[in-house]
Amino acid sequence: MSELEKAMVALIDVFHQYSGREGDKHKLKKSELKELINNELSHFLEEIKEQEVVDKVMETLDNDGDGECDFQEFMAFVAMVTTACHEFFEHE
């Protein structure tokens, strides 16, 4: 498997490690999203401690307004973070 294919599988795996702990196994609730960000993105994003921050992140990601983050919305988030990191490291 190529590095890109491994990365794609890892993204799917990480999403499903956190989704469905508290409901729909295909979506992240706010608490699941917070845990995922704090555990899996700790080198790129600050730890989320305040509920307001979680609410704001979810509001930004939740395109369909269901109060949860589906895989497509999660991937949009990953793309945003990856783009920001790429731009940061490109200028160093």
UniProtKB/Swiss-Prot annotation:
Q: What Gene3D superfamilies does the database record attribute to this sequence? A: EF-hand (1.10.238.10)
The subcellular localization recorded is: Cytoplasm; Nucleus; Secreted
In this chain, Zn(2+) is annotated as bound at 16, 26, 86, 91
Q: Gene symbol?
A: S100B
Database matches in InterPro entries: EF-hand-dom_pair (IPR011992), EF_Hand_1_Ca_BS (IPR018247), EF_hand_dom (IPR002048), S100-B (IPR028481), S100/CaBP7/8-like_CS (IPR001751), S100_Ca-bd_sub (IPR013787)
Identify the GO cellular component terms for this protein.
Answer: ciliary basal body; cilium; cytoplasm; cytosol; extracellular region; extracellular space; intracellular membrane-bounded organelle; microtubule cytoskeleton
Q: Residues that bind Ca(2+) 1, according to the entry?
A: 19, 22, 24, 27, 32
Organism the protein comes from: Homo sapiens
What are the EF-hand domain coordinates in residue numbering?
A: 13-48, 49-84
Q: In which tissues is it expressed?
A: Although predominant among the water-soluble brain proteins, S100 is also found in a variety of other tissues.
Explain the purpose of this protein: Small zinc- and- and calcium-binding protein that is highly expressed in astrocytes and constitutes one of the most abundant soluble proteins in brain. Weakly binds calcium but binds zinc very tightly-distinct binding sites with different affinities exist for both ions on each monomer. Physiological concentrations of potassium ion antagonize the binding of both divalent cations, especially affecting high-affinity calcium-binding sites. Acts as a neurotrophic factor that promotes astrocytosis and axonal proliferation.
What name goes with this protein?
A: Protein S100-B
UniProt: Ca(2+) 2 binding residues = 62, 64, 66, 68, 73
What superkingdom does the record give? Eukaryota
Blocked amino end (Ser) occurs at 2
> Might you name a Gene Ontology BP term for this protein?
astrocyte differentiation
